[in-house]
Amino acid sequence: MVKRIITISREFGSGGRFIGEEVAKELGIAYYDKNIISQIAEKSGLSPEYVQENAELSPKRGLFAYAFAGRDITGKSVEDLVHEAQRKVILDLAEKEPCVIIGRNADYILKDRDDVLNVFIHGDMPEKIKRITRLYKVNEQEAVKIMADTDKRLGRNYSFYTDQKWGKASNYTLCLNSSQLGYDRCEKIIVECSK
């Protein structure tokens, strides 16, 4: 079956965003990543800046703090409002057109669809560190910290909203090591598997 929607979850520094962009170009389909922030903001009633900061990485706090966080009249926290708006936007995009969606728990949100290819991109530590130092102009020690913090928050968010383990192979159709395969080969494999 042809896969109209490709979700790409990724470790920080693995090149998942770049690979996703290239896949979308190759297939001639839409690419969604940070460009859906305004749609999420509109649906949630929050500012695009707040959504940008919190959509994929919330909840930042522990469960105790989350339990006592501010709530709206329905009892939902701000993090829950962002997540719910994000879920609605992703479902709308999947109905609207073939596309590549980066992160945002899209693999889980779209898990009941047959036309979705769920991909997880990971990489070897030395390669990810090199990429982060080059792109973010930081030293190796800072790159390791940024990578660890980001992956921890991505994993926490995924687990919190899906009750699944982020990066666990059984949650995805395809898991690719971008360090071992290279970006071009990852792109080609994803394109081929989508047909």
Predicted regions and their residues:
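Small-molecule kinase domains that catalyze NTP-dependent phosphoryl transfer to phosphate-bearing small molecules
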Residues: P59-Y66, N139-D184
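Short beta-strand-centered segment that lines the nucleotide-binding/catalytic pocket of NTP-utilizing
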Residues: A30-A41
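Glycine-rich phosphate-binding P-loop
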Residues: I8-E21
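ATP-dependent small-molecule kinase phosphotransfer cores
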Residues: A41-P98
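RNA pseudouridine synthases
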Residues: L93, A106-D112
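Pre-Walker A (Motif I) flank of P-loop NTPase domains
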Residues: V2-E11, E97
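Conserved phosphate-donor/acceptor-positioning beta-strand/loop module used by diverse small-molecule
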Residues: D112-R134, E140-A148
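Short, amphipathic alpha-helical "lid/cap" segments that border enzyme active or binding sites
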Residues: R87, Y183-V191
